[in-house]
């Protein structure tokens, strides 16, 4: 409760599977949120919804779900920690979705855990030179943050770790060397996999 005053941001990390998400909670989410949403869409538009629906939920201590947001796309960084565990062919699922045969598909999941964390544009550690992205102090993401900052160290990342580029672009540094630069607040998501969450 003492930490509930911080701003709602884009996802800063995640892990999958979640230990709270048991059969009882899944049923509650389906009955209270997912099925009424899809049914309401059909009643309001006369069309069946075909695609991905992402429900951003908050689960209370009483295990009651509340909706924060609904998107018609995969969540970010949620997809980065969920999809590596999917063993069913994603293209096959997409085809079945478009053909109206998704109900015939069986999803197969790895028992491994995936944990992801976002590297963000934070507060500058030292004042920037006047020619760099406007200079001056900035608080960092989710507030005003620096862009066009060089990214280094990716060659040191364990090869088993997945690196997703969220806010990066190639450019040239002062020596005209091609390298990665930041373009947004959430810059990279690094996802590791293990047999347990602790691993």
Regions found by a protein language model. Name each.
Residues 196-198:
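Short amphipathic alpha-helices within nucleic acid-binding modules
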Residues 1-33, 72-86:
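ATP-dependent carboxylate/phosphate-activation module, predominantly the ATP-grasp catalytic core
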Residues 59-63, 121-122, 172:
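Short acidic-glycine loop/turn motifs at beta-strand connectors
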Residues 145-189:
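Generic long, charged, amphipathic alpha-helical segments
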Residues 53, 66-68, 186:
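Protein kinase-like catalytic core scaffold
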Residues 14-17, 117-119, 186-194:
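Short, well-ordered beta-strand elements within core beta-sheets of diverse protein domains
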Residues 30-53, 71-158:
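Active-site "cap" helix and flanking loop/linker of ATP-utilizing ligase/carboxylase catalytic domains
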Residues 56:
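Short, surface-exposed charged micro-motifs
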């Amino acid at each position: 409760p003492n930490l509930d005053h911080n701003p709602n941001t884009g996802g800063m990390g995640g892990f999958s599977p979640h230990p709270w998400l048991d059969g009882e909670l899944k049923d509650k989410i389906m009955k209270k949120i997912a099925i009424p949403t899809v049914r309401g869409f059909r009643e309001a538009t006369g069309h069946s919804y075909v695609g991905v629906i992402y429900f951003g939920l908050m689960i209370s201590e009483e295990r009651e779900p509340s909706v924060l947001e609904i998107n018609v796309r995969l969540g970010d960084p949620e997809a980065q920690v969920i999809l590596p565990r999917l063993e069913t062919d994603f293209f096959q699922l997409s085809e079945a979705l478009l053909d109206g045969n998704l109900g015939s598909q069986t999803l197969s999941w790895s028992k491994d855990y995936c944990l992801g964390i976002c590297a963000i544009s934070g507060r500058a550690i030292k004042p920037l030179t006047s020619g760099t992205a406007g200079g001056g102090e900035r608080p960092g993401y989710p507030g005003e943050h620096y862009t066009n900052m060089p990214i280094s160290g990716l060659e040191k990342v364990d090869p088993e770790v997945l690196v997703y580029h969220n806010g990066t672009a190639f450019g040239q540094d002062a020596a005209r060397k091609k390298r990665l630069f930041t373009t947004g607040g959430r810059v990279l998501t690094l996802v590791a996999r293990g047999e347990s969450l602790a691993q």
